[in-house]
């Protein structure tokens, strides 16, 4: 997943270097944080030693929090050398609530926002009666479970939660025992925030067990490995809630096509595009690449992106954006770009305007004087 996203940043840097409103040149430094908060802190030091004033990270809210903590200290102690953090995929709501920071801007929709959109879709499906939760045992997985129960109770109090499993992150090799529990529970739907091998192997186990009467509602169905695991067997029964899908019209379309040609891989992290378009617009407005000036410009900024008009909310630096619920189907019609050469893709079934998924914030932002 991380390798794919590094390539996405490098590829889009090349694209934006060809032409951008600010006339700046982007250079990407890739450092492996090994999914560890400790490694992240030393990776951040290394990036800053190499002169980076903007850092991007996304996989894991633990590492994201490590960056926020380190930058709060670094920026306070080193005026004139401030560093800005663009978070493209770490979705723990705390990062823009109790742990919010002036130096952190989130480009993905957080766990609670995605659950608002997903449950708005699910509440209107009469066949959804019994839901099973399976998630990774760390902050993100805990949040998916918590918000699923809280928000569904508000919208469809009759829905029963018949299972709530947490498993170690990226360690389970065989999900058959979990699938057996799902089968035994009588669930008609599974909600999971799993990503990477934890989603790919979960879906594979469901296919192997012939679990054909259960729909899976995912956050990360399009991410590396999962499309291949789903294949034709999962068509029509896996859904995804996300700010994008593979077949968006507009500026992202050609980029996705060109990326696939170049790498024989999918560019599924659209927030990388958000990052470049938002920064170039802010650089052009401020006529500067100084993170202090740019941060002030980003607050409350509205810009057109691939999923409509988006806004970087000033109170907590959480991007307000439209979300799609899409369904794993055979490619065809308007939806010709497939995932991982499977001949299948996530086809949008519903688009929700930003207000539907918007959630309040408890952020008490400390702004630099």
Task: Name the predicted role of every residue range.
Residues 1-10, 31-37, 59-60, 134-143, ...:
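Extracytoplasmic "Venus flytrap"
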Residues 38-42, 94, 102-209, 244-254:
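Extracellular/periplasmic Venus flytrap/periplasmic-binding protein
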Residues 47-61, 78-88, 130-135, 186-196, ...:
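Periplasmic-binding protein-like
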Residues 101, 203-275, 281-289, 338-368:
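Extracellular/periplasmic periplasmic-binding protein-like sensory domains
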Residues 2-22, 147-154:
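Short, polar/charged alpha-helical segment
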Residues 22, 284-297:
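Short, charged, surface-exposed loops that flank catalytic or proteolytic processing sites
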Residues 3-7, 19-95, 107, 167-175, ...:
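Beta-alpha junction/loop-to-helix N-cap segments that form part of ligand/metal-binding clefts
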Residues 302, 306-369:
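Solvent-exposed, acidic/polar segments of extracytosolic/periplasmic ligand-binding ectodomains
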């Amino acid at each position: 997943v991380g390798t794919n996203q590094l390539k996405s940043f490098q590829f889009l840097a090349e694209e934006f270097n060809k032409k951008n409103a600010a006339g700046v040149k982007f250079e990407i430094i890739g450092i492996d944080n090994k999914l560890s908060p400790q490694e992240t802190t030393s990776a951040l030091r290394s990036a800053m030693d190499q002169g980076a004033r903007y850092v991007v990270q996304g996989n894991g809210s633990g590492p994201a929090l490590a960056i926020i903590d380190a930058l709060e200290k670094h920026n306070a102690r080193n005026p004139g050398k401030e560093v800005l953090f663009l978070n493209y995929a770490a979705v723990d709501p705390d990062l823009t609530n109790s742990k919010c920071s002036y130096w952190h801007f989130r480009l993905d929709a957080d766990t609670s926002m995605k659950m608002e959109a997903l449950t708005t879709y699910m509440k209107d499906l009469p066949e959804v009666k019994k839901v099973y939760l399976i998630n990774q045992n760390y902050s993100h997985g805990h949040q998916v479970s918590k918000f699923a129960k809280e928000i569904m109770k508000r919208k469809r109090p009759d829905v029963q939660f018949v299972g709530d499993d947490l498993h170690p992150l990226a360690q389970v090799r065989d999900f058959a025992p979990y699938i057996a529990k799902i089968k035994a529970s009588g669930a008609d739907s599974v909600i999971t925030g799993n990503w990477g091998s934890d989603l790919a192997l979960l879906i594979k186990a469901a296919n192997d067990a012939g679990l054909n009467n259960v729909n899976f509602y995912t956050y990360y169905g399009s991410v590396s490995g999962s499309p291949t695991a789903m294949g034709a067997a999962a068509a029509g029964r896996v859904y995804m809630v996300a700010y994008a899908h593979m077949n968006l019209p507009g500026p992202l379309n050609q980029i996705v096509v060109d990326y696939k040609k170049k790498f024989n891989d999918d560019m599924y992290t659209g927030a990388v595009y958000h990052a470049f378009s938002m920064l170039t617009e802010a650089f052009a407005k401020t006529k500067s690449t100084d993170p202090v000036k740019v941060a002030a410009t980003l607050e409350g900024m509205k810009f057109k992106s691939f999923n409509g008009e988006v806004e970087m909310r000033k109170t907590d630096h959480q991007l307000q954006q439209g979300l799609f619920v899409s369904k794993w189907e055979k490619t065809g019609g308007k939806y010709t770009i497939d995932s991982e050469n499977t001949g299948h893709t996530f086809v949008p079934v519903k688009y929700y305007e930003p207000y539907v998924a918007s959630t309040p914030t408890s952020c008490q932002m400390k702004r630099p004087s």
